[in-house]
């Protein structure tokens, strides 16, 4: 091959390569910081629509496009709800929203706020107290994670398939779905058999009569059409609930540590005390809507009497002792945490 022909071919190849590069779309607005956000509920759930999506959108907007957060609901990146914490800790995903109850014993200090008579059917107040106590009393639960905010739902009620609950004796012998080990402690004290079932599987266990009732808030009724599988929604006098669940929205710690300060400040500004309280308020509103939905579809809202509720409260105080014993097994003194929580919840 002559040098002239060889040179001509090279020029032709280089020209084609340049034209190919020039024809490729160039995204001048590509985000500098991209995040995978994984959680366990459907994109149609109130939590996704009213809490997660607005939070994500606000951070993206305040970063002027430098941050892009892709949300993956319903465990679409794989695994079970119980895997979310390890996925975040191991960097499989960047952000998670999950119930602490899916990983029993991993957040022992925080479990206090799930107990009956600590949470008093005011999720905004519970969020405020958790925020005040986080650095000194709760942070050790969250190694490998950067907690952005914690919250609780409005509180567990008994959603019964067919049995009408009238007093403390009604619970005895019932098979009840529990969302957490703290829920199991509650059911143990009431004489019920607890069956651990993640939220996405509750409908199946109800429809197959594996359980007689589910310990769950009203909020999620419309998403899973729980009114079609239950008849009674039962709570105590004056809004008394049978404990609650704690949730976390957290980031992989290594991911957090690599972020520049200005991006960190955007996340922090949207995860301050007002957000911890706001999350609780969102869940209270959604809970009210869920109850209205059930009643509007023919379900029966049962409120136990004052005397019956007081008897239940006295029984469920024992769950505090169970929690203290569990912490002592981990060489954690739970008494100061319990005393501080009671003090702040009473303010």
Question: What residue ranges belong to the model's regions?
Answer:
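Bacterial N-terminal signal peptides that target proteins for export
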Residues: 2-15
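A subset of signal/propeptide-processing and intrinsically disordered low-complexity segments
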Residues: 4-5, 22, 60
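Sec/Tat signal peptide C-region and signal peptidase I cleavage site
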Residues: 24-30
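N-terminal secretory/targeting leader peptides
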Residues: 31-122, 140-347
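A gly/proline- and charged-residue-enriched helix-loop-helix capping module
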Residues: 120-137
């Amino acid at each position: 091959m002559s040098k002239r022909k060889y040179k001509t071919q090279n020029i032709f190849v280089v020209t084609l390569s340049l034209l190919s590069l020039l024809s490729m779309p160039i995204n001048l607005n590509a985000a500098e910081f991209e995040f995978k956000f994984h959680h366990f509920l459907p994109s149609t759930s109130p939590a996704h629509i009213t809490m997660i999506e607005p939070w994500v959108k606000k951070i993206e907007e305040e970063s002027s496009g430098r941050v892009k957060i892709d949300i993956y609901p319903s465990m679409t990146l794989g695994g079970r709800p119980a895997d979310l914490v390890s996925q975040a800790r191991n960097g499989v995903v960047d952000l998670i929203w999950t119930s602490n109850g899916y990983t029993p014993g991993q957040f022992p200090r925080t479990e206090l706020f799930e107990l009956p008579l600590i949470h008093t059917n005011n999720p905004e107040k519970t969020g405020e107290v958790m925020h005040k106590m986080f650095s000194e009393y709760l942070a050790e639960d969250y190694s490998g994670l950067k907690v952005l905010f914690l919250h609780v739902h409005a509180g567990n009620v008994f959603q019964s398939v067919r049995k009408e609950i009238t007093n403390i004796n009604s619970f005895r012998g019932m098979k009840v779905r529990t969302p957490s080990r703290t829920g199991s402690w509650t059911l143990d004290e009431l004489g019920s058999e607890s069956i651990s079932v993640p939220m996405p599987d509750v409908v199946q266990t109800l429809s197959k009569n594996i359980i007689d009732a589910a310990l769950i808030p009203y909020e999620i009724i419309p998403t899973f059409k729980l009114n079609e599988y239950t008849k009674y929604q039962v709570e105590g006098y004056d809004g008394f609930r049978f404990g609650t669940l704690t949730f976390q929205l957290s980031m992989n710690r290594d991911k957090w540590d690599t972020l520049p300060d200005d991006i960190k400040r955007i996340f922090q500004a949207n995860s301050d005390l007002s957000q911890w309280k706001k999350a609780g308020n969102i869940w209270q509103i959604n809970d009210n809507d869920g109850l209205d939905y059930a009643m509007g579809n023919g379900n029966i809202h049962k409120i136990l009497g004052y005397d019956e509720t007081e008897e239940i409260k006295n029984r469920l105080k024992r769950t505090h002792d169970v929690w203290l014993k569990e912490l002592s097994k981990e060489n954690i003194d739970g008494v100061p945490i319990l005393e501080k929580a009671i003090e702040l919840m009473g303010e």
